[in-house]
Amino acid sequence: MTNKAHISLAEIKAPLASELDKYEEFMHKALHSESPYFNDILQYIFDNRGKGVRPTLVMLFAGLYNGGAPFGERVHLAASLIELIHTASLVHDDIIDKATMRHGQASVNTKWGGRNAILTGDFILSRIFELGMESLEFDILTYVSHTIKWLCEGEVIQDEQTKTLAMTHERYFDIIDKKTASLLAISCGVGALAVKAPAAEVDKAYTIGRAVGMAFQIKDDILDYAAADQTGKPTCADLREHKITLPLLEAMAQMSAEEEAATRTLVGRGDDEAIGEIYAKVVKYSGRERAEGIMADYIASAKTALINYPASPYRTALEAMCDFLAQRKH
């Protein structure tokens, strides 16, 4: 592979070349309805998916444990179920957040309305259980279904914290563990499970994935304080929704009690002037840099654990994935 500073997701996926087409075929069948109108919505979602980080993690961990042998349908099923969970959560998130765009295209709720978007997300969730039951791979279905519960819990806890402006480091890490890290952790764990790795190895893969997932969300929260031309997103979008994330928590940890209280009041206001003041405080107290340090610790933890696996293209790709996620600009 090329230098880690210039690694691309396509290069990371290179060891999976013989399996990606099979996964894509499985996913296309999963996102299908007999209704032509409904199928138009599902095809739109299929055509406008994101980077595919989570199913890639599933397959890389499967490769890590099966020694490069052909995967078989269990792995393609596991990767597809993970991507379906992620896809359904994004459709529902866009409704909750009233988001008009997703991956540079109109969101489903913008294009087809909120009612159809809700039903589309529900349909995708139903396909997860239908595919799992039809395949009789109950161990995989049971394992991945846990994350649906955790995603919902994380959203509700975050909503409560947003209303009270009482976010703390402990609550923040609990929220991102449930909202984001859980799905990446399950992605890695189910990759091992799909090739029938021992339970202890599944747990080990899960732990690595959790560290990657925590870093992934922290990076997202750091990017929210970056310039809009770097991310393609509105600067401080979370603050506009009264969300306190790690860069601000790290900045507030350096403040006096009085200044911290005043800053939380500014978050509650959420207007442009207040956001400008908060942004200046995050810069003043090196909130982004401190958050970067915490993110780097999670990445280092994941990479240290990966060193214990035998050298292989899959291990190399997973190490590169850690660098890719840490260095991404959007």
Regions found by a protein language model. Name each.
Residues 1-330:
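All-alpha prenyltransferase/terpene-synthase fold signal
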